């Protein structure tokens, strides 16, 4: 299966497309201008569509992905603020856009061609709304509020309207700054990375008296035995096998590996690796064989191989990219 890598370069105002070989060797095949600074990108695999959040003319550009991974611009859709995170519901009928700077989460229907329409709902006053991600098993949208140190919980109705769950809100530690979120493959556990205090929270989802509940079961530092004042954590991802979790910090320029306890799904710190300068974004391929980290300040990205037995990373190569790479995705072509 052919793999391509998409890198969003904010200051260069472009998306780079790279081939990724099984050996880990990479080569640039396309560079497409975005007519503005770019931040989040995301893909709907079954439709071969890539969505990019553009500012200061706040909009989402939809690109088609051809059989070789090349991008072609299809449409522009206006949004009411700067996009920081793009995600979708399970059926890929709705697009969720988080805005850290405008403090909202919006819901936009996708038409039959996958094009975002005008938002049908905007929930304001979510301070520092940095990310929102749907738990497909429980039909709950987890909406991150970095500045409020909390996570809002919403059910999604069949009509695309968000309504608060019975629990409504999860509180993280004060001044922790929750930023990004990932679900365990079984969808029963949630991992959130806290930008400001350098920790990861582990949450368990369960049902009690037919009501869905979420509780915190662990808080663990991204760096072992280094409890310092300054952290600047950014991204978090888990392998599809559910055994390994990775998290990065931009202050220390590291990426840490955790093993996931197969009994309770809590995290066990394993190792940290020095990586590219200011690692804002990274991604893991679908086969769990490679991990790529983009250095926002170094304007480079590094590709590692992943050990199947331990999750350990081994550097393969470093490549130069555009100015200020802020988002990276690895896509398997059908």
UniProtKB/Swiss-Prot annotation:
<dbReference type="InterPro" id="IPR015943">
    <property type="entry name" value="WD40/YVTN_repeat-like_dom_sf"/>
</dbReference>
<dbReference type="GO" id="GO:0017057">
    <property type="term" value="F:6-phosphogluconolactonase activity"/>
</dbReference>
<protein>
    <recommendedName>
        <fullName>6-phosphogluconolactonase</fullName>
        <ecNumber>3.1.1.31</ecNumber>
    </recommendedName>
</protein>
<dbReference type="Pfam" id="PF10282">
    <property type="entry name" value="Lactonase"/>
</dbReference>
<dbReference type="GO" id="GO:0005829">
    <property type="term" value="C:cytosol"/>
</dbReference>
<dbReference type="GO" id="GO:0009051">
    <property type="term" value="P:pentose-phosphate shunt, oxidative branch"/>
</dbReference>
<comment type="pathway">
    <text>Carbohydrate degradation; pentose phosphate pathway; D-ribulose 5-phosphate from D-glucose 6-phosphate (oxidative stage): step 2/3.</text>
</comment>
<comment type="similarity">
    <text>Belongs to the cycloisomerase 2 family.</text>
</comment>
<keyword id="KW-0119">Carbohydrate metabolism</keyword>
<dbReference type="GO" id="GO:0006006">
    <property type="term" value="P:glucose metabolic process"/>
</dbReference>
<dbReference type="InterPro" id="IPR019405">
    <property type="entry name" value="Lactonase_7-beta_prop"/>
</dbReference>
<dbReference type="InterPro" id="IPR050282">
    <property type="entry name" value="Cycloisomerase_2"/>
</dbReference>
<dbReference type="InterPro" id="IPR022528">
    <property type="entry name" value="6-phosphogluconolactonase_YbhE"/>
</dbReference>
<keyword id="KW-0313">Glucose metabolism</keyword>
<keyword id="KW-0378">Hydrolase</keyword>
<comment type="function">
    <text>Catalyzes the hydrolysis of 6-phosphogluconolactone to 6-phosphogluconate.</text>
</comment>
């Amino acid at each position: 299966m052919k793999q391509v890598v998409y890198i969003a370069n904010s200051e260069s105002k472009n998306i780079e497309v790279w081939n990724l070989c099984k050996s880990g060797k990479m080569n640039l095949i396309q560079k497409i201008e975005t007519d503005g600074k770019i931040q989040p990108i995301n893909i709907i695999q079954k439709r071969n569509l890539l969505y990019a959040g553009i500012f200061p003319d706040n909009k989402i550009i939809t690109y088609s992905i051809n059989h070789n991974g090349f991008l072609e611009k299809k449409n522009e859709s206006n949004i009411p603020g700067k996009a920081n995170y793009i995600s979708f519901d399970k059926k890929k009928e709705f697009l969720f856009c988080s805005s850290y700077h405008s403090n909202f989460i919006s819901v936009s229907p996708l038409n039959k061609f996958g094009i975002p329409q005008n938002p049908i709902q905007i929930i304001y006053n979510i301070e520092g709304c940095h990310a929102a991600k749907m738990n497909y098993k429980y039909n709950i949208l987890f909406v991150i509020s970095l500045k409020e140190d909390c996570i809002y919980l919403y059910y999604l109705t069949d009509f695309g309207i968000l309504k608060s769950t019975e629990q409504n809100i999860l509180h993280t530690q004060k001044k922790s700054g929750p930023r990004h979120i990932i679900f365990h493959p079984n969808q029963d556990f949630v991992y959130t990375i806290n930008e400001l205090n350098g920790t990861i929270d582990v949450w368990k989802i369960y049902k009690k008296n037919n009501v869905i509940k979420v509780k915190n079961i662990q808080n663990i530092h991204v760096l072992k035995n280094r409890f310092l004042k300054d952290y600047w954590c950014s991204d978090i991802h888990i392998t599809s096998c559910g055994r390994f979790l990775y998290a990065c910090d931009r202050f220390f320029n590291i990426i840490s590996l955790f093993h996931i306890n197969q009994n309770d799904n809590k995290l066990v710190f394993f190792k940290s690796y020095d990586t590219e300068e200011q690692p804002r974004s990274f991604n893991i391929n679908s086969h769990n064989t490679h991990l790529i980290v983009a250095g926002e300040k170094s304007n480079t990205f590094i590709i590692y191989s992943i050990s199947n037995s331990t999750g350990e990373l081994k550097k393969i190569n470093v490549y130069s990219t555009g100015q200020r790479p802020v988002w990276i995705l690895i896509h398997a072509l059908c």
